[in-house]
């Protein structure tokens, strides 16, 4: 069994893909993008391109409107379709205030994973509903402790 990889020693196409994700989210979110962080296996050195997903947390300065949520979700669908790995991307977009001061379950503006791909692509998803996720608090702790910054301040600054 091969050893896992981290962002630093990931294959070139994976690193380039992270650059593309960062650029696309920056284009869609503009000045509202406060930070973008890798967590999970790719941050910890346990990433295997043939099976691991790419876990990301995007932090925004302000809440996203429903049309912006939809635009971001569709951008994530397109990015997923262009991924260089077998595992998909898993992205949660949360407001900075929640990244700094936990609320449980944690509110989020957008979540993308394989399970959400088709409902988003087929426009069968209601972006006007505010949602929460009980797992996001653990993901934020993971980002704070082992996260890799793609954009924004170091993840350790995500504390109140």
What are these regions (language model features)?
Residues 21, 25, 72-79:
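Hydrophobic alpha-helical packing residues
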Residues 25-29, 44-49, 81-83:
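Short secondary-structure boundary/capping segments within folded domains
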Residues 32, 41, 46, 53, ...:
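Residue-level preference for alpha-helix termini and adjacent loops
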Residues 2-7, 74-160:
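Conserved NTP/Mg2+-binding pocket subregion across the NTase superfamily
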Residues 1-37, 68:
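Helical scaffold of the NTase/Pol beta-like nucleotidyltransferase catalytic core
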Residues 20, 29-41, 130-141:
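Phosphate-binding glycine-rich loops and adjacent basic patches that engage nucleotide phosphates
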Residues 40, 44-74, 88-95:
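Catalytic metal-binding acidic patch
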């Amino acid at each position: 069994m091969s050893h896992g990889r981290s962002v630093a020693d990931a294959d070139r196409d994976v690193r380039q893909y992270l650059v593309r994700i960062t650029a696309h989210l920056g284009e869609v979110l503009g000045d509202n993008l406060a930070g973008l962080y890798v967590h999970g296996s790719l941050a910890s050195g346990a990433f295997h391109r043939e099976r691991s997903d790419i876990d990301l947390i995007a932090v925004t300065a302000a809440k996203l409107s429903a049309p912006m949520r939809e635009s971001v979700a569709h951008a994530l669908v397109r990015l997923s379709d262009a991924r260089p790995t077998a595992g998909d991307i898993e992205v949660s977009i949360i407001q900075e205030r929640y990244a700094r001061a936990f609320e449980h379950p944690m509110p989020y503006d957008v979540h993308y994973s394989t399970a959400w791909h088709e409902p988003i692509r087929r426009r069968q998803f209601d972006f006007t509903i505010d949602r929460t996720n009980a797992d996001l608090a653990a993901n934020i702790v993971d980002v704070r402790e082992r996260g890799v910054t793609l954009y924004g301040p170091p993840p350790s600054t995500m504390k109140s």
